[in-house]
């Protein structure tokens, strides 16, 4: 197995203090005397038998994001949705089940193979019936899984050939991971996992980093780079110049190195906060408050930035929520306040039966991609504020004993600009070896685009918030079921009697009037 650790440090300030020191197991363990954000990449060659899942689906990838935010350096700016997300690409596109169609009694056979693959490689017990389906993909979401799944992968593929060889494990740092991913490298026949770890000194007061290769035959590379200021957070496509030291366990001494790359993921200007309008009923509204955001500028063509960048929000909603695509069509309706409309629904997949109670749904939930139309006359690069509201619906929850509310939680949507590239930019594009290519939302866009992610707003100096919205859904109290049933029955009977009496009164009153008229005529 090969391990590559990339550390972003301030070489101008701490360069003379940085060194690579072998640990207890010689070159198999290093202590790096600097603490800064880092990305660990593990690549493990596998056999055809390990990749049997590709006989049933075209691809499988996994992405995980911590439900709390942290400052991300530009080089590791790719945003991850909170929780664990699995994307399975079908071998052939097919239409998903539509509203009103009968549910299949068994999970799709290919998903059974996917569940087995995830269990073997990541230790994830996934129910194949909980996947939701779009025309080209299956997706799965779990808010409770942590970074330990990626440690399971490293443990599995780090079995030393010599049983007497000591297994060196520093995977406890995975507990601090901010994000992680897992994918299949089809060309190299490798399984790859990447883990991004924040500045441990800043968040956890650790001053050194310990990095190891598990066995003597494994390869370990550690790079410490200084990020040049040319890679700005406002750049349409910023150029990052990286200089630093590279340690390779197959070589005797660290080497100076220099890279020029163009990150596909960038940190956009401004911030976002997300919440439901309060109080929350059965028809809540999700509010996005975007502050000091700016349309990314194209530094290669100053008159070209606005028309190439568009703003999106990618939602993942648990089964307690459903999206009404007919109601969301109203986002495009023009008003005096929104002359171009508020936005438009571009993609929606997941649980199809809108009025089905939550306790009858099998899939984990639904996903939606929405384009947001900015209302601004500000030129590109100029900050402005924007509010966006998305109407939602809550499913009926199962009655509970002694409870009138069911606690629920939904992850924040990802909010980002997507900017198209010109042919010249694509031709001169310098691919970053640190780019994330297997995040679920990236399959919704062409390859030749860059992303500018809008991060969460800090909560009044108390640090970053949890990237989730909590609420209570009203439920029936099962303790009061008998009383409510009896009361309802009495009221129904009483109502029936009242209506019957009213009808009979009219009938008898009509007969009496007829008799009266008849008597008058006879007189």
UniProtKB/Swiss-Prot annotation:
Glycosylation sites: 26, 387
Compartments where found: Endoplasmic reticulum membrane
KW Electron transport (keyword) present: no
Chief location of this protein within or outside the cell: endoplasmic reticulum
Ranges facing Cytoplasmic side: 505-523
Membrane topology: Single-pass type III membrane protein
Domain of life (superkingdom): Eukaryota
GO CC terms of this entry: endoplasmic reticulum membrane; glycosylphosphatidylinositol-mannosyltransferase I complex
GO biological process: GPI anchor biosynthetic process
Membrane side Lumenal: residue ranges: 1-486
Keywords: Endoplasmic reticulum, Glycoprotein, GPI-anchor biosynthesis, Membrane, Transmembrane, Transmembrane helix
Protein known as: Protein PBN1
Gene this chain is encoded by: PBN1
């Amino acid at each position: 197995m090969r391990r590559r650790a990339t550390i972003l440090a301030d070489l101008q300030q701490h360069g003379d203090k940085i060194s690579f020191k072998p640990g207890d197991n010689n070159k198999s363990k290093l202590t790096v005397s600097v603490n800064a954000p880092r990305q660990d990449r593990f690549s493990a060659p596998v056999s055809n038998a390990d990749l049997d899942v590709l006989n049933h689906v075209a691809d499988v990838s996994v992405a995980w994001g911590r439900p709390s935010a942290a400052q991300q350096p530009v080089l590791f700016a790719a945003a991850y949705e909170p929780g664990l997300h699995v994307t399975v690409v079908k071998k052939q596109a097919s239409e998903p089940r539509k509203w009103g169609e009968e549910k299949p009694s068994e999970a799709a056979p290919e998903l059974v193979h996917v569940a087995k693959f995830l269990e073997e490689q990541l230790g994830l017990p996934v129910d194949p019936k909980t996947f939701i389906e779009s025309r080209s993909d299956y997706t799965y979401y779990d808010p409770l899984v942590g970074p330990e799944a990626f440690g399971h992968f490293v443990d599995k593929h780090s079995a030393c050939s010599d049983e007497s060889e000591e297994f060196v494990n520093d995977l406890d740092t995975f507990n601090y991971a901010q994000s992680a991913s897992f994918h299949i490298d089809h060309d190299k026949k490798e399984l790859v996992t990447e883990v991004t770890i924040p500045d441990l000194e800043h968040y956890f007061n650790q001053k050194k980093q310990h990095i190891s290769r598990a066995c003597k035959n494994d390869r370990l590379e550690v790079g410490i780079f200084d990020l040049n200021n040319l890679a700005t957070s406002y750049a349409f496509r910023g150029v990052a110049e990286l200089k630093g030291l590279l340690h390779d366990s197959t070589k005797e001494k660290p080497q100076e190195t220099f890279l020029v790359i163009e990150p596909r993921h960038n940190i956009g200007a401004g911030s976002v906060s997300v919440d439901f309008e309060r109080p929350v009923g059965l028809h809540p509204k999700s509010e996005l408050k975007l502050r000091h955001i700016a349309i990314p500028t194209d530094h290669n063509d100053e008159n070209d930035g606005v028309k190439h960048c568009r703003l999106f929000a990618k939602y993942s909603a648990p089964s307690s929520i459903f999206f009404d695509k007919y109601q969301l069509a109203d986002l495009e309706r023009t008003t005096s306040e929104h002359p171009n409309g508020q936005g438009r629904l571009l993609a929606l997949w997941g649980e199809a039966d809108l009025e089905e109670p939550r306790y009858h749904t099998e899939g984990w939930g639904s996903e939606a991609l929405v384009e947001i139309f900015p209302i601004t006359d500000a030129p590109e690069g100029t900050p402005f504020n924007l509010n966006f509201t998305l109407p939602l619906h809550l499913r009926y929850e199962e009655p509970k004993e002694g409870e009138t509310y069911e606690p629920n939680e939904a992850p924040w949507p990802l909010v980002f600009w997507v900017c198209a590239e010109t042919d010249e930019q694509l031709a001169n594009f310098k691919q970053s070896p640190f780019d994330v290519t297997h995040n679920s939302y990236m399959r919704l866009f062409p390859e030749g685009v860059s992303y500018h992610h809008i991060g969460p707003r800090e909560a009044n100096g108390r640090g970053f918030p949890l990237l989730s919205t909590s609420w209570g859904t009203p439920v029936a109290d099962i303790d009061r079921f008998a009383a409510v049933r009896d009361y309802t029955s009495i009221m129904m009977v009483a109502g029936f009697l009242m209506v019957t009496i009213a009808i009979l009164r009219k009938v008898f009153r009509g007969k009496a009037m007829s008799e009266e008229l008849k008597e008058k005529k006879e007189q």
